[in-house]
């Protein structure tokens, strides 16, 4: 029955989520002073002014823009719950697609000799090129150092692995005291239990297509697929038969949420 449900969910006549009564949870922006803005409730206009930065919201995208000069740096935190997603254009023009159940902490403006953000969960980054100021994504297991490139980071705290997938450019990944070079079409995987690291060639669309609103699974375990869907649609999965977790599926289509 579970397999039939999954098949209907991905390949049925109606798109996923179209008539299932799924409502996107609140997406919140925490300002430096601790105040929280519920972005789902905010009209598309200027949200606030932070020092010399103007923050606006449109089409599920926050945009930070310079409106003056200041040495003041403040940190904002963008948080999505299960079923939610949001994008942010940082002060340097870097665009970040934040997936469900994820948190991104970042400065309202970048000063100093690097651009650093902190991620828990999953995000896709399109980093503005700056050879003099590397962009660094920090997770609990990896530091990803780039200067201008596109890549996906999957760093959920309750997952068994942390994965960074490079679409184009080049990245340096600092992990377990070592630095690893990752090239386009490669993925670096950190196994949390064994502390092991591997770099392998992958189909990047399997890991990055979500940011364009599509899913793609290729010979993927049912448990892994349903774990992903549970985040996208804020549902809990209960297995009456544990053996079905190992069944594998190949499917692709549009995400509607």
Predicted regions: what is each one?
Residues 5-257:
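A residue-level detector for the "anchor" residue at the start of short, highly conserved motifs
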